[in-house]
């Protein structure tokens, strides 16, 4: 079962837990009762979402949230909140008077499911969903760790 740390009993709404059958339905996750879905748009459902035991209503893979609208990517700027990160998007803005570009950025708060391990500096892909709180309107769909980025400078291979 999931870690019950809240006062209310945490469970997935589409899974019946009081089955009289023995064996298979005892624990969620691998071989047990667990609701998960394919969100489409070319994103694979993480293995942790299928086999894990976490309960998260705002998760796009195991919760009741659908992804629609914009798909954005950026860098994780802050991961200090619980299940929420700040995604920084850098862009260039053209100044007509000087005929040059200036650097600008925007910070977007996004909900991160427990099936992802996100640290500062990781590249993340986020998708728009319904408002999850006062400021959060996006959900993390994919994480690329900071060290394994295929985009960037290649190391010198030698002679």
Swiss-Prot record:
The cellular location(s) given in this protein's UniProt record come to: Cytoplasm
Query: Which Pfam family name is an example for this entry?
Result: Ribosomal_S17
Q: Which UniProt keywords apply?
A: Cytoplasm, Ribonucleoprotein, Ribosomal protein, RNA-binding, rRNA-binding
Q: Which positions carry the signal peptide feature in this UniProt record?
A: none
GO MF annotations, alphabetized: mRNA binding; rRNA binding; structural constituent of ribosome
Per the record, its GO cellular-component terms are: cytosolic small ribosomal subunit; plasma membrane
GO BP field: translation
- Name the family: Belongs to the universal ribosomal protein uS17 family.
Q: What is this protein's record name?
A: Small ribosomal subunit protein uS17y
| Organism listed in the record | Arabidopsis thaliana
